[in-house]
Amino acid sequence: MVISLEYKWIAMSNVLISSLMGTINMSIVLIALPAIFNGIHINPLNSFQYLLWILMGYGLVTATLLLSFGRLSDMYGRVKMFRLGFLIFTFASILLYLTPSTGDAGALEIIIFRVVQAVGSALLMANSAAIITDAFPSTERGKALGINTVAIMSGMFLGLILGGILAVFNWRYVFLVSVPFGLIGTIWSYYKLKELSVKAVKTGLDIWGNLTFLVGITLLLVGVTYGLIPYGSSPMGWSNPWVIASMIIGLISLIMFPIVESRVESPMFRLDLFKNRSFAYANIAGLLSALGRGGMMFMLILLLQGIWLPLHGYSYSSTPFWAGIYMLPLTAGIIIMGPISGILSDKYGPRWIATGGMIIVTIAFLVLASLPYNFTFIEFALALFLMGIGGGMFGSPNSASIMNSVPPEDRGVASGMMYTIMNTSFTASMAIFFTIVIVGLTQRFPVAMTASLANIGAAQLSPILSNISPTAALFSAFLGFNPVSSILSALPAPLAAMIPHSTFNTLTGTTWFPSTLANAFIPSLQTSFYIGAILSAIAAVLSALRGGKYVHGDEILKTDSNNGLKPQEVETEE
């Protein structure tokens, strides 16, 4: 089928709308959480489980559905599923805006509606790369996927800014902002998108594969999530029998998953595609990259909101907005390099461009790990910009490498597999990084609190303030407020009157708690950055092993001694 120049950009515009809508929605919630919790009258210090589910539930549901939706799209049409994704996402955004309840009921409604929204997001994500790949020739796919990367990162930044602005007026507006995107995308895709894909043979749904993957991923991530929440007298939940059972059953299910997929007639996770060298190494490199970088943004926002911004005179209420502003160098690096790396990979192949990107990311992690908590912004911005440049160099060439390596009828399932690996790794990375930080805080925070109180002559408050759990301290930083103020305001009047006025002002000011938290937080944060550097370095090695430039379907005529001329797929060296 001949694809017009006009249609390529029509398809691209549809995908860009979905990318902007999805990523704006993800980051806008991240920044607006304090306003959301205040709006539904939830005390975040006592509601960690709601915070974690609002943050991680979206990624969990998306990750578990991508594979099935990718396979269904190959069988029934990518455009049809893409349109349905727009419709569901828009409907869920309206429900979130209209959330009627407050308190625990309101939090549960938001979580449920976010799950519905994630279903729409999974339908969009499973098909976006495949629709671009169908519409663009192999010589332009890297550029096209690079442009989509720019839209994704622009959406992340716009979400941070919009969340900071809209939450000031009404927390519901942070969900309403997705509705115009959804309506435009639904109408535009219905009237303009065409079904260009070669449909795969319709087969039965892989029920056992879906079941083992869904159970495995869900229980494993649920176990990790509740492992972060205090249980009984323990500051973390790893001794909770339900957490232990979830982790064990989840791991067993995931071990069973490839065994099941190797035996069913129509697997949703096509293990045979991993026989292709380019597909296999690109996906594994992507997995390690996502594991290394997935939790990094949350850790950096914790660092900015809980420590650096208050130390530099920003009020706690303003830190969510300014944290988004100070993350701009990361976004700028990706926006600059995304299209450039895509164009270069179209011409020279993805191997060395993507590998160079992971090497730069490794260096950026090491720079971040070397910074003191009271760093200068120039140092921080340089590290973030390097991280963005490296991420931009890796992202679009790696995606193009994966999508170019499969036949047209398998692009939906390949896209679903790619984004499943990416989303699962991002969600797991966030849980892993949180765990590393909380374990470190558990060991160091009570000691740091006692020492800081003694330094200001308030050792008598140690029994009270040392009871702040590490989890409470961490999420207080994440939500941008000082938990010491809440605790002191709840003290009985006679006890509060015994605290000297100058000491009270020091405790509730913008510098004492961040400095105390920093002494316990920074060593664990540095450990997370070193782990990110190691994972990125391994990803660079695997990226280099992917082989030369390869595009499935590009053929040359070779002379066969028995059959004369016949077409063959080849791998060209860079």
Q: Over which residues does each language-model region extend?
A:
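Transmembrane-helix exit segments and adjacent C-terminal regions of multi-pass membrane proteins
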Residues: 1-15, 23, 278, 346-349, ...
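Hydrophobic alpha-helical segments of secondary membrane carriers
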Residues: 18, 147-151, 205, 285, ...
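Transmembrane-helix bundle of Major Facilitator Superfamily
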Residues: 2-191, 341, 368-369, 380
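Hydrophobic alpha-helix/TM-entry signal in multi-pass membrane transporters
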Residues: 8-15, 82, 110, 205, ...
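Transmembrane core module of solute transporters
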Residues: 12-59, 241, 253, 263-399, ...
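Hydrophobic transmembrane-helix bundles of small-molecule transporters
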Residues: 169-284, 292
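C-terminal module of multi-pass small-molecule transporters
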Residues: 65, 77-88, 93-96, 100-112, ...
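Interfacial helix-cap and linker-helix signal at transmembrane-aqueous boundaries
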Residues: 36-37, 72-73, 162-170, 224, ...
